[in-house]
From Swiss-Prot:
GO cellular component: extracellular region
InterPro entries per the UniProt record, alphabetical: AB_hydrolase_fold, Peptidase_S10, Ser_caboxypep_ser_AS
The protein's role, per its UniProt record: Acts as a positive regulator of grain size by controlling grain width, filling and weight. High expression of GS5 in the grain is correlated with large grain size.
Residues of this chain annotated as glycosylated in UniProt: 152, 269, 301, 354, 375
Group of enzyme by EC: hydrolase
Originating organism: Oryza sativa subsp. japonica
Disulfide cross-links: 101-366, 263-274, 298-333
Subcellular location per the Swiss-Prot or TrEMBL entry: Secreted
Signal sequence residues: 1-28
UniProt protein name: Serine carboxypeptidase-like 26
Gene for this chain: SCP26
Superkingdom, natural source: Eukaryota
């Protein structure tokens, strides 16, 4: 079995090398200098199955982040709808988590982009709640190895951690702005969900530090960040996951008491007894959708490499010993539609992706390889929150209250741990005369819940998601009356 695994690994390395050598000829163009011609070369006139109207101004392609290693990240960019002109609206970067999940397959094509993949991946449909009504939307497949993003150095895939991801994302931004200089002075915000609860604040912190020389050509007009159902702090995330499962009748009182007795979540390595108790929670969630506990479970064929049963609830208990290694944000039905669509040759051709046709294996919405090899070295992002709040950045956190994976309880614990003074107490916000959720304003931060939404708020509650991002971008308060 070990020999077969080694042989498979060698085959993957060879396939990857062939792909990247074929891409290497285009690396000079991915560096990002010059704007104009490179920008226009990335324009996507129309994707297969895209509705004829309304018009969507979009670009896609590769931007180099490390010439020596041959690393390039793939992006999909939508200009904001007119009135005012796109150049006058904010630029919003969106990152999905996992680690290992595609911001194109999830954020763009399933959640908040103007074009969503229809059922069975047959076509695209217009999303009337696309966030490009409020901002220019930039979706990035990160880290390398995710989606169409690639590296010419196979060892990169074994060295992935939060610092690596932040540095590559920063290099991407610097080079992307060279290609799209008309957006260089726009207000810039970073957003994302699930494990992007690490990516987003860490990238914001890196931009903040590099911005200290305001005269530098790499200065980025960062104004704030917003994260949804974010993994933030190991202790509070794990504590909240267990408490949410018990309080929502997923597990019995006896199981919860066992967890409280055997689990010290302040230790990153769980004991055997704690691991066994927590696996009872995961086994119960295997019967429903952990990412939206009140939604029907997707019953599509789950024999693929991205099967939730295999990827999330493997019998190998070592998978959960150090961290809860489940893709943060996985929806098997929508990911299947995205995989059907983005694996079509005519789509990839129109998308300027996988030009050589030698992508190692099929395009996947989530990569098991990235998830299982990722070095989870950062246990808490809360110190970054404290730092950037003091620096004056706008910081929002929102949470769909039906998510069992990164539940609202976890986020409340995290926010309360910051010790910020309350500005406006917990209260309801409204959409169409109905309670859309609750929010609390602190001095320096806002936390919002979205009633009835799961892990993927823009997918589950699109109208609420659009109202939320509009309030965030404009620095406004959510409506508090019917």
């Amino acid at each position: 079995m070990a020999v077969a695994a080694a042989a498979a690994a060698r085959r993957r390395d060879v396939s990857c090398l062939l792909l990247l050598l074929c891409f290497s000829s285009s690396m000079a163009a991915t560096g990002g200098g010059g704007g104009g011609g490179e920008q226009e070369a990335d324009r996507v006139a129309r994707l297969p199955g895209q509705p004829a109207s309304p018009a969507v101004s979009q670009f896609a392609g590769y931007v180099g982040v490390d010439e020596r290693h041959g690393r390039a990240l793939f992006y999909w960019f939508f200009e904001a709808q007119a009135s005012p002109a796109p150049e006058k609206k904010p630029l919003l970067l969106w990152l999905n988590g996992g680690p290992g999940c595609s911001s194109i397959g999830y954020g763009a094509a399933s959640e908040l982009g103007p074009l969503r993949v229809a059922r069975q991946g047959a076509a695209l449909e217009f999303n009337q709640y696309g966030w490009n009504k409020e901002a220019n939307l930039l979706f990035l497949e990160s880290p390398v190895g995710v989606g169409f993003s690639y590296t010419n150095t196979s060892s990169d895939l074994s060295n992935l951690n939060d610092d690596f991801v932040a540095e590559d994302a920063y290099s991407f931004l610097v080079n992307w702005f060279k290609r799209f200089p008309q957006y260089k002075d726009n207000e810039f915000y970073i957003s994302g969900e699930s494990y992007a609860g690490h990516y987003v604040p860490q990238l914001a912190d890196l931009v903040y530090e590099r911005n200290k020389d305001k005269r530098a050509s790499t200065y980025i007009n960062l104004k704030g960040f917003i994260v949804g159902n974010p993994l933030t702090d190991d202790y509070y995330d794990s504590k909240g996951l267990a408490e949410y499962a018990w309080s929502h009748a997923i597990v019995s009182d006896q199981v919860y008491e066992r967890i409280k007795k055997t689990c010290n979540f302040k230790n990153s390595n769980w004991t055997d007894d704690c691991n066994a108790a927590m696996n009872i929670i995961f086994s119960q969630y295997n019967q429903i959708d952990i990412y939206n506990i009140y939604a029907p479970k997707c019953l599509l064929n789950s024999t693929s490499a991205s099967s939730p049963d295999r990827a999330f609830f493997a019998n190998n208990q070592e998978q959960f010993r150090w961290r809860i290694k489940m893709f943060s944000g996985y929806d098997p039905c929508y990911s299947s539609y995205a995989e059907d669509y983005f694996n079509k040759h005519d789509v990839q051709e129109a998308f300027h992706a996988n030009a050589s046709g030698l992508l190692p294996g099929k395009w996947q919405v989530c990569s098991d390889q990235i998830l299982n090899s990722y070095n989870f070295s950062v246990l808490s992002i809360l110190p970054i929150y404290s730092k950037l709040i003091k620096a004056g950045l706008r910081v929002w956190l929102y949470s769909g209250d039906a998510d069992g994976r990164v539940p609202v309880i976890s986020s409340r614990y995290c926010v309360e741990a910051l010790g910020l003074p309350i500005k406006t107490d917990w209260q309801s916000w409204y959409l169409d005369k109905q309670v859309a959720g609750r929010f609390v304003e602190y001095h320096g931060m806002t936390m919002v819940t979205v009633r009835g939404a799961g892990h993927l708020v823009p997918l589950n509650k699109p109208a609420e998601g659009l109202m939320l991002i509009n309030a965030f971008l404009h620095g406004e308060k959510l409506p508090t009356s019917r």
